[in-house]
Amino acid sequence: WVMIVNKAEKSGRVYMSLEKTKPTDYMRTVQDYPVEGVNFYDINSLFAQPAWNQVAAELSVEVQTRYNRTGDLSHVVGIESRGFVVGAVLASVIGVPFIMVRKKGSKYPGSLLQETYALEYGEDTLVIQEGILGYTNRVLIADDLVATGGSALATKRLVEQTGATVVGFASVLNLAYLNTDDMKSQPLITCEEIIK
């Protein structure tokens, strides 16, 4: 695998394209799921392939190069549920703690902060344990996929409630044609971008 990195200077985004294989080559697309008109990119089919190890390693290297070598990153936050896989791998490789942001109603003890956001097909609420992050922390938010950016931006607001600073986002796949203007302005490292 050879990584070609194209850095968009103004937005701070980094798109990595795999010269031989793209993550979507290993991802099943399910049409009209979870509701009609929505296409679901099933990253579980990528996780089940040896190619996932290479994708995770390359994403980790780019994140580490961009953030952690300068000491600009103290934690990785993963968004439930597939963001747990991506985020935990990034945190482990980089050598920083991993924090989970969960969906409201999940088993998460203690006092919680919450943030509600709109989905393409409804709304949802995310929670984080109060006191798990603080003012000195600098956080990267990780998920499998960014579409509108609703859950990513809600997680950003949630992390900011703790007093921590969000330095950027990382994902395996970015559906750029669905990104809101707010999401387009955020620093993002992604393995593959779909423009449509």
What spans do the regions from the language model cover?
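PRPP-associated nucleotide enzymes
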Residues: 1-196
